[in-house]
Each structure stands twice: as structure tokens, then as C-alpha cells.
Swiss-Prot record:
Its main location: cytoplasm. Keywords: Coiled coil, Cytoplasm, Lipid-binding, Membrane, Mitochondrion, Mitochondrion outer membrane, Phosphoprotein. It comes from Macaca fascicularis. The modification Phosphoserine is found at residues 85, 156, 159, 285, 287, 509. This is Mitochondria-eating protein. The gene is SPATA18. GO terms for cellular component: cytosol; intracellular membrane-bounded organelle; mitochondrial matrix; mitochondrial outer membrane; mitochondrion. The keyword rRNA processing does not apply. The lineage of its organism: Eukaryota, Metazoa, Chordata, Craniata, Vertebrata.
């Protein structure tokens, strides 16, 4: 910029301009109109050249200032001057500095009437502030909840420690009493033997009778004391089991509140172990925490897990399938069939597991009347020995040969492994209840039962027949514990018949090698009836 400024000064253009103005003023009255116009145009051209050089210097100076420096100066001085100059030139009036500039007019209009963008920004700011306040409130609530959970957990741990300490004291007292009784018995035996040696033969029989009566009385007292202590010990063990269950529930709830998304089930690691009860009898001892839980508590926990599977795990599985399948009906059919197959496989696995437990416990309970109770207690204590991964593989194989969802193969059912594993674990644990829980039988085209099912939102609420099922109903004997969900449409019976005929033709087609593999596998495990293959199994 300094070079341009030096060049402008060295040209002496402004001095020449002043000299021309003075000479024109002297000759103005003697010149003609054309001569005056020529002088004026020459001056304008010279001024334009000077002005061009000044604008170049202005541009260079603005560039040296960066992106932000000089912006306010240009807005406050250059823009109003250009506006006034162009306005005066267009109207033929001299430049008046008192005329309000266009920039000032724009500023006044902007302050007077804010633009929609400004209003949107203000609305977004207000929404952001409210969201931040809500987030802070939720964080405070979460911190308070975690604090309460921690306090409850500490109280439960203290109660558990106190109960264990009391049990240890009772065990010590029991050992002390047993030692005293043994010492008393030994002392009584020694006295009786001495008396038998010192007294004559006639009194020896009387002494024996007295000693036997004393021994019977002592044994009776010992039995009563031992039974009392055993009752107290059993009650304390039951209290410890309940406290342990509450502690585990609180720990699971606190871990779920800390994690934002449901992680893979931690039970899957323990359930993937060997399911052989014979080895478990040698290595593991029955845990009182599981065996002493009441049937009502286990039933309530399983119902809660089954409800969570319907409300959360089912929707997660639908989201996974919707990435590969666009049709919502197919997705819901796949999830329903997966649930039904999971219950079927879990029930079969429970029967085999109970048979193995019977075989392994038979030598230990020969001639005992509590054999069935021992089997039930062992099964309840060792539900984590269930090989859920093997059941998941069986369910996926059964789904691969189901004609309703496997032809044509549009998705790999391994996507649903986590969902199937959770349903298998729930169904397996439900078989250990008294009485066991099971799902209701459902077939496409059946009459809609309002006691068992709810209609889905996209159903025809006047249709009497079920087009397909979304979720099975949960039954206890013949009573409905939890309703399922079904879709009802007009003409559902004929649609089911047509789909069944198509399934038969496709499953028996020699062109598709997958159907042949599925039929061979199915003939080994289940009945090859096409109706049984086409409809859900239990």
C-alpha cells in the first residue's frame, strides 16, 4: 500500500487538478458551452483516475486488516457515502450529509421488526434452555436414586452380615451343647461300669434299666434341643436367602440405571457351561439363595421378564429385522414363530434336564420319600446349568425349515440370537414353577378370543378371525396370566388356507435344495406333516 500511496503523491495529480480548476474559473465566462463541458469532463476523468487509485489503496488496506478489522469503518462511512452519492447523482441534487442512509434505514427496520430467522433463533434458544434445565433435573434425580439404591444395598449387606454372624453363633452353641452331651454320656457310661463292678449281680440289672431310662431321657432332650436349633438355623437361612435375593435385585436395578442401553445378558456366560447334573452334584452344592425363594417371587420375576421381552426385546428384534425386510407382517410372523419355537425347545430341554437330575440323584436317595422334593430343589438351584446356546441353535434350525418364514430365505435368523436366548431362559425357568407356565396355542384363521389376545392397532376391529399372531398369550393351566396380541382381518381364514397351500408347494419343490435339507432335518426331529410344519408348534 505504501508504494501505491507514494506513486499517487509523486504524480501530483491533485495539484494539476487544482490548477485546472483555477484556469477554468477564469475562462468560464468567455468559453462556449462545449468548451466548459470539455473542461468539466477532463476534470471528471482526472478525478476518476485519482478515485480509482484511492479505491485500490482502500482495498489493499482492508486486505491487510484481515477478515474483521475495518468492517465497521466501511459500514459506517463508505456505504452511507456511496448511497448518498448515487441517490444525489440519480436525482440531480447535491450530496447532503443530513439525508438518512440506507444502512441506517435497514438497521431501524431490523430493530423494529425482527426477521423470522431471529424469532426462530430465539425460540431455539428458549427450547435449548428448557431442555438443559430438564436434563439437569433428570441428572439430579438419577444421582438421588443412585444414592438411595446405595443406602438400601448397604442396609441389606449389614442385615446379611448380622444374620450370618448369628448363624455362626448358633452353630458354635450347638457344637458346645453336643460336646457337653457327649461328655455327660461318657461320664454316665464310666459310672455305670464302675457300679456294675462293685455291686452284686442282682442289682446290676436294675442299674442297667435305670441307665437305659436315663439315656432315653437324655436322647429325647438332645433331640428336642437339636430340632429347635435346626429350626432356628432353617429360619435364618430363609431370611438370608430373601436378603440375598433383594440384594441381587437392587444390584441389577442399579446397574441398569447406570447403563444407557441394555447390554448382553450376563447369564449367557454361566448358561453356556455344561448342563450335566452328574458333574454338578460332585462339584457344586445346592445354593439356599435360589432354592428357598418362594414360588410366588420367582413367578413374579419371570412375569416381569416376559413383559419386558414383549415391550422392549421384541421391538429391538423388529428393528433388526426391518433393516432386511420391509414388510411388517413378515417381521411380526418371524418374531412370533421364534417365540413359539423357543418355548417348545426350552420345554424339551427342561424335560431332559430333569431326567438327568433324577438319574444322578437316584443313588443318594434310595428308599427316601423326599426324592421328588430333592429333584425340584436341585433343578431350582441349578437353573444356570441350562445350555441356552444349544437351544438357540435348535430354534434357528426349526425356523429355517418353517415354510411360512424361510421360503424364500430373506434374512439370517442368527440376528435374533439374543432375543431367542432370553425367551429360552424365561421358558426354561417357567417350567420349574408349580404349576408351570406355558404359552397358548394359536393358529392362523382361528376365531379371535378376547380373553387371550388384544387386537393390534392395524387390525380390523369388526373381523372375527385372526390373520396372524404378534405375541402369544401366557397360560397357567387353563387360566390366562398375560394376554397376547393378534391381527384380525376380514377373510383371514381363506388367506391362511392359501398361504398354507403355497407353503406346501414350496416346501416340497425339488428345485430348492434348502427345502430338501429342511425336510430331512425335520423328519429326524419332528413329525413331517405339512400342516404341523406350516402352523406354530408347542
Amino acid at each position: 500500500m505504501a508504494e501505491n500511496l507514494k506513486r499517487l503523491v509523486s504524480n501530483e495529480a491533485l495539484r494539476t487538478l487544482q490548477e485546472k480548476l483555477d484556469s477554468w474559473l477564469k475562462e468560464y465566462n468567455t468559453n462556449t458551452c462545449d468548451q466548459n463541458l470539455n473542461h468539466c469532463l477532463e476534470l471528471i476523468e482526472q478525478v476518476a483516475k485519482v478515485q480509482g487509485q484511492l479505491f485500490g489503496i482502500l482495498t489493499t488496506a482492508a486486505q491487510e486488516g484481515g477478515h474483521n478489522d475495518g468492517v465497521e469503518t466501511i459500514k459506517s462511512r463508505l456505504l452511507p457515502w456511496l448511497e448518498a452519492s448515487f441517490t444525489a447523482a440519480s436525482m440531480g441534487k447535491p450530496v447532503d450529509s443530513k439525508v438518512p442512509s440506507l444502512q441506517n434505514t435497514f438497521d431501524r427496520e431490523r430493530r423494529k421488526d425482527p426477521s423470522p430467522r431471529d424469532r426462530d433463533m430465539q425460540q431455539l434458544d428458549s427450547n435449548l434452555n428448557s431442555t438443559r434445565s430438564q436434563l439437569n433435573q433428570v441428572q439430579d434425580d438419577l444421582a438421588e436414586t443412585e444414592k438411595n439404591l446405595e443406602e438400601t444395598k448397604n442396609r441389606s449387606a449389614i442385615s446379611l452380615l448380622a444374620a450370618e454372624e448369628e448363624i455362626n453363633q448358633l452353630k458354635k452353641q450347638l457344637k458346645t451343647l453336643q460336646a457337653q452331651e457327649d461328655a455327660r454320656h461318657r461320664h454316665t457310661d464310666q459310672r455305670s461300669s464302675e457300679n456294675r463292678r462293685s455291686e452284686p449281680r442282682s442289682s446290676e440289672e436294675r442299674r442297667c434299666e435305670q441307665w437305659s431310662s436315663l439315656k432315653r431321657n437324655a436322647d429325647q432332650r438332645d433331640t428336642e434341643v437339636t430340632s429347635d436349633y435346626k429350626k432356628q438355623l432353617r429360619n435364618l437361612k430363609e431370611e438370608i436367602a430373601v436378603l440375598s435375593a433383594e440384594k441381587s435385585a437392587l444390584q441389577g436395578r442399579s446397574s441398569r440405571s447406570r447403563s444407557p442401553s441394555p447390554a448382553p445378558r450376563s447369564r449367557s456366560c454361566s448358561r453356556s457351561r455344561s448342563a450335566s447334573p452328574s458333574t454338578a452334584v460332585k462339584v457344586r452344592s445346592p445354593s439356599p439363595n435360589r432354592s428357598k425363594l418362594s414360588n410366588v417371587a420367582r413367578k413374579a420375576a419371570l412375569l416381569s421378564r416376559f413383559s419386558d421381552s414383549y415391550s422392549q426385546a421384541r421391538l429391538d428384534a423388529q428393528c433388526l429385522l426391518r433393516r432386511c425386510i420391509d414388510k411388517a407382517e413378515t417381521v411380526q410372523r418371524i418374531i412370533y414363530i421364534a417365540t413359539v419355537e423357543a418355548f417348545h425347545v426350552a420345554k424339551m430341554a427342561f424335560r431332559h434336564f430333569k431326567i438327568r437330575v433324577r438319574k444322578s440323584l437316584t443313588p443318594s436317595y434310595v428308599g427316601s420319600n423326599d426324592f421328588e422334593n430333592a429333584v425340584s430343589d436341585y433343578v431350582i438351584c441349578h437353573l444356570d446349568l441350562y445350555d441356552s446356546q444349544s437351544s438357540v441353535n435348535d430354534v434357528i434350525r426349526a425356523m429355517n425349515v418353517n415354510p411360512k418364514i424361510s421360503f424364500p430365505p430373506v434374512v439370517d435368523f442368527c440376528l435374533l440370537s439374543d432375543f431367542i436366548q432370553e425367551i429360552c431362559c424365561i421358558a426354561f425357568a417357567m417350567q420349574a414353577l408349580e404349576p408351570p407356565l406355558d404359552i397358548a396355542y394359536g393358529a392362523d384363521g382361528e376365531v379371535f378370543n378376547d380373553c387371550k389376545y388384544r387386537r393390534s392397532y392395524d387390525s380390523d376391529f369388526t373381523a372375527p378371525l385372526v390373520l396372524y399372531h404378534v405375541w402369544p398369550a401366557l397360560m397357567e393351566n387353563d387360566c390366562v396370566i398375560m394376554k397376547g396380541e393378534a391381527v384380525t382381518r376380514r377373510g383371514a381364514f381363506w388367506n391362511s388356507v392359501r398361504s398354507l397351500s403355497r407353503c406346501r408347494s414350496r416346501s416340497l419343490s425339488p428345485i430348492c435344495p434348502r427345502s430338501q435339507i429342511g425336510l430331512s432335518t425335520m423328519s429326524r426331529s419332528r413329525s413331517p406333516s405339512p400342516i404341523r410344519c406350516g402352523l406354530p408348534r408347542f
